[in-house]
């Protein structure tokens, strides 16, 4: 890939305030990342769209709004552009329409603030639509985020040859943490309460609530239709595309949302994975490859006591060794965590 000509980002933080699913660090995660993008990676403020569910947010992170923002990024990208999506919020696993789709027999999804789910098949479709020479990096700090780009090649994950020895480590020092997980049954129950219809198929409720703005991959959950391969997915081999996923955990694991105990205003809530990425970037101001960044973040989480959360990397072989966000040269970080 040639050096990026334009850098465009969509940052999404969902705290689900005043609900039983409330998290605390997700908005902080993406605001810190926005500062990093500008100070270190050459992004311009006007090319970064931030969607949060804060009370004063001008654009809420609904499924439709997230989809539109990502769709604009992909549609307007030119060869050499660098696209970035950072999501911090809840994730879920959906029973697969195709039971042998992959090992966990479920599809990964993120949970926007209105529960209009966006699935791994949706992200695959976005990557397939990329123009040649455009990179699309995703950081998903959510539960079950491993494999969030469907069929992306695993570089660091459950079956990776990259092993970090799990030596004895202290448990998480700040015990006030919560998994970024909403179980599928809870998602279905919530959507059922909103739609008012009786159905065990999630697609029925999503269609009733969101119509054509729902995920196309969930419309035919009752009578599943295999996704077509006749579209833009034929432009390049699946293992040669420019989708890059840095996930907060494996597909069968949870990611942690940390809320420092007490009323210490100097310690903000954060997502464990987002914080580990930001700490690694702050401590190593030189160029880091995608592989190096994930390995260092995985090691840091282990040192912090997160022995059951393993960040993963999914991308082509070439992109595994490519610089994170195609950084060139050494740039000092001006922002703080």
Predicted regions and their residues:
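Intrinsically disordered, low-complexity segments that are common in secreted/host-exposed effector
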Residues: 44, 49, 59, 157, ...
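Caspase-like (clan CD) cysteine peptidase catalytic core
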Residues: 61-88, 92-157, 165-185, 189, ...
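Generic recognition of well-structured, leucine-rich alpha-helical segments
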Residues: 18, 40-44, 73-77, 113, ...
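Catalytic cores of nucleophile-dependent amide-cleaving enzymes
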Residues: 16, 27-28, 107-157, 209, ...
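Boundary/activation segment at the start of structured domains
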Residues: 1-105, 121, 234, 241-243, ...
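Caspase-like cysteine protease fold
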Residues: 9, 188-266, 280-337
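Short, small-residue alpha-helix embedded
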Residues: 271-282
């Amino acid at each position: 890939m040639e050096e990026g000509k334009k850098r465009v980002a969509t940052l999404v933080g969902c705290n689900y305030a005043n609900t039983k699913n409330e998290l605390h660090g997700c908005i902080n995660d993406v605001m810190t990342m926005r500062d990093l993008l500008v100070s270190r990676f050459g992004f311009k403020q006007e090319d970064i769209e931030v969607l949060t569910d804060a009370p004063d947010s001008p654009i809420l992170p609904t499924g439709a709004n997230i989809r539109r923002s990502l769709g604009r990024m992909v549609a307007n990208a030119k060869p050499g552009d660098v696209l970035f999506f950072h999501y911090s919020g809840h994730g879920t696993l959906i029973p697969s329409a195709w039971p042998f789709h992959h090992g966990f027999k479920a599809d990964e999804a993120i949970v926007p603030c209105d529960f209009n789910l966006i699935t791994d098949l949706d992200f695959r479709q976005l990557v397939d639509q990329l123009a040649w020479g455009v990179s699309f990096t995703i950081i998903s700090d959510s539960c079950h985020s491993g494999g969030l780009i469907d069929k992306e090649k695993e570089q660091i994950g459950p079956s990776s040859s990259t092993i970090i020895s799990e030596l004895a480590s202290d448990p998480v020092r700040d015990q006030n943490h919560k998994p970024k997980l909403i179980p599928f049954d809870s998602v279905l129950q919530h959507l059922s309460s909103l739609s008012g219809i009786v159905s065990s198929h999630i697609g029925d409720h999503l269609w009733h609530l969101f119509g054509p703005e729902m995920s196309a991959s969930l419309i035919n959950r009752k009578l599943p239709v295999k996704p077509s391969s006749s579209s833009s997915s034929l432009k390049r081999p699946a293992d040669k595309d420019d989708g890059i996923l840095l996930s907060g955990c494996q597909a069968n694991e949870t990611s942690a949302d940390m809320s420092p105990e007490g009323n210490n205003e100097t310690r903000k809530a954060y997502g464990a994975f987002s914080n580990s990425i930001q700490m690694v970037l702050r401590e190593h101001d030189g160029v880091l490859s995608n592989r190096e960044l994930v390995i260092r973040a995985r090691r840091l989480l282990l040192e912090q006591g997160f022995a059951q959360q393993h960040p993963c990397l999914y991308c082509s072989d070439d992109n595994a060794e490519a610089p994170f966000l195609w950084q060139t040269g050494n740039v000092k970080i001006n922002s703080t965590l």
